[in-house]
Amino acid sequence: MTTEDTLTIAGRSYQSRLLVGTGKYQDFAQTRAALDASGTQIVTVAIRRTNIGQNPDEPSLLDFVPPSQFTLLPNTAGCYSADDAVRTLRLARELLDGHDLVKLEVLGDPQNLFPNMPETLKATRTLVDEGFKVMVYCTDDPIQCRMLEDLGSVAVMPLASLIGSGMGILNPWNLRLIIDQSSVPVLVDAGVGTASDAAIAMELGCDGVLMNTAIAGARDPILMASAMRKAVEGGREAYLAGRVPRKLYSAAPSSPTEGLIAAVK
C-alpha cells in the first residue's frame, strides 16, 4: 500500500483508516497506550462522558491525547434527540476552540442503541447549516445514507451490527450498496468484535472502520489494538489487490499441463 492511498475526510488526509474510541479503558494511560498500538490518527470522544475541560478539577483526556498529536472527533454518545445532540456538539466546539469535525449519533433505544434516523437527519441538517463537518452514525439503509450525503455529511458510518455487540458484519450486501452509491467516505461504525471483522469490512471496500469496545473490552486491549491495525491494513490491501472470483470448480489447473518432464521409464 502506497503513501498515496490515504483516507480523506473533509479535505484532510490520514494514513490510518482505523478510528478508535476513548471510552471503557481502565484509565487514560491505557487509553493512550491502545491508541499508540492501533496507529490511529482520529480518536472519538464522548463529550457527555469524558472530561476534556468541562471539569477543571478532574483529569482531562487532553493531557493524554493532545489535539496536537491526534484529530479529535467529538461525538454525541448518549443523546436521544436532535436538540440534545446539537447542544452537545456546540459545547464541544466551544471547548475545542472552534473544532468543527464531529461525529453525530442520535440513539433511539437505550437497550440496543440503534440510531433514531428521523432525529439523526434533523440534527444533521442543523449542524451542517451551522458549519459543522458531520460524520454520521446511521443504519445500513442505503436510502438513509443517500439522504445524509445529500444533506451535506462528510462521511456516513453505517453500523455493522449493534454497538458493543461484537457480532461482526451482519449485512455485507447493504454495506456494498452504500459503498457503490456514495461519493463521501463510508466507515463501518459499531459491531466489530475481532480482527477478522475489521478485515472483512475493508475487503468489502469500506474506507475505514471505527471501534471502541472491540479493543477496550478485549482481554489485552493493547495487543488487540495492534491486531486491529494489521487487520485494517491487510483488508485494505486485499481490496486494492482484488480477490479471485469465487467458483465451485477451477476452470483450469493451477499448474501448467504442457512442457512437463516425461516420466522416467
From Swiss-Prot:
Residues at the catalytic site: 103
Pathway listed: Cofactor biosynthesis; thiamine diphosphate biosynthesis
GO CC list: cytoplasm
Reaction(s) catalysed by this chain's protein: [ThiS sulfur-carrier protein]-C-terminal-Gly-aminoethanethioate + 2-iminoacetate + 1-deoxy-D-xylulose 5-phosphate = [ThiS sulfur-carrier protein]-C-terminal Gly-Gly + 2-[(2R,5Z)-2-carboxy-4-methylthiazol-5(2H)-ylidene]ethyl phosphate + 2 H2O + H(+)
Presence of the UniProt keyword Nuclease in the record: no
Keywords: Cytoplasm, Schiff base, Thiamine biosynthesis, Transferase
PANTHER family, per the entry: THIAZOLE SYNTHASE
Function noted in UniProt: Catalyzes the rearrangement of 1-deoxy-D-xylulose 5-phosphate (DXP) to produce the thiazole phosphate moiety of thiamine. Sulfur is provided by the thiocarboxylate moiety of the carrier protein ThiS. In vitro, sulfur can be provided by H(2)S.
Protein name according to UniProt: Thiazole synthase
Gene behind this protein: thiG
